[in-house]
Regions:
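ATP/NTP-dependent adenylation/nucleotidyl-transfer catalytic domains that generate, transfer
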Residues: 25, 128-243
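ATP-dependent adenylation/nucleotidyltransferase module used to activate substrates
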Residues: 1-131, 135-139, 148-162
């Protein structure tokens, strides 16, 4: 849970449909990446409390011994999104396993998923395109209730049903491929309104077809978390501890 409109809307939505079920326990997870002035734990705590959901908090510094600010100071901000997203997934999965959580709900919307697909294409990352992360051993399965909902509609849902969230842009996002793709996709989608839906559908089909053999999952020798192929989170950890 970031404290923004997407994660706030998701938590409200899940509480509304699952809150009365005795066989389901709902938790919110907040991870502090260590970016000065970007995360305010009080905001996420207030949102979780107002909805009536227990909040689990952790940070890159506590789990990995490094913050994104420290990484950027040593390596620059060009690849900050790669480090941040990869390590977020690692820490999130670790928290879920530690607390016996059986499903992780993500606030990713249509815009996010379409952008991520294009980023993987531009980077030539076939493994991320063709093999879902939660197919790996010990990776907690993920659900994305807002997958086909445009970002604007998710934001409206949050505004109409609750408040207290923040809209804050990461200070390192200005120099990343993700930001360029986001801008490019929005401009193209303005002229061709079905583009984002088409990209998300393409991504779903690519995963289901499994058009190329991919390496089996392994266990990271440094952190004990699952990894596969050339994209391994333990490689990030090694880099972090050598910056």
């Amino acid at each position: 849970m970031s404290g923004g409109e997407e994660s706030s809307a998701l938590l409200y939505f899940l509480k509304k449909i699952l809150g009365t079920r005795r066989d389901v326990s709902l938790f919110a997870i907040s991870i502090d990446e260590g970016i000065k002035g970007y995360r305010d734990r009080r905001i996420t705590a207030n949102i979780a409390e107002s909805i009536g959901v227990e909040l689990i908090t952790d940070s890159f510094d506590e789990v990995l011994g490094k913050t994104i600010d420290e990484v950027v100071r040593e390596k620059g901000d060009r690849f900050s999104c790669i480090f941040c997203k990869g390590l977020q997934g690692l820490v999130l999965n670790q928290i879920a396993n530690d607390h016996d959580i059986t499903k992780l709900a993500l606030g990713l919307n249509l815009d996010d998923e379409a952008k991520n697909l294009l980023v993987h294409i531009f980077r030539g990352d076939a493994e991320r395109l063709l093999k879902p992360a939660d197919s790996l051993f010990r990776v907690v399965p993920m659900i994305r209730p807002f997958l086909y909902i445009p970002a604007r509609e998710v934001a409206l849902y949050a505004y109409f049903n609750m408040g207290g969230f923040e809209i804050r842009r990461c200070p390192y996002s200005h120099n990343t491929l993700e930001t360029d793709v986001h801008s490019l996709l929005n401009k193209y989608n303005w002229r061709h309104p079905s583009t984002k839906n088409a990209l998300v559908n393409l991504g779903e089909h690519l995963v289901s077809y499994g058009v190329m053999p991919l390496p089996d999952a392994g266990i990271c020798p440094d952190c004990g978390e699952p990894c596969h192929g050339e994209y391994q989170e333990w490689g990030m950890l090694r880099e972090l501890h050598h910056v």
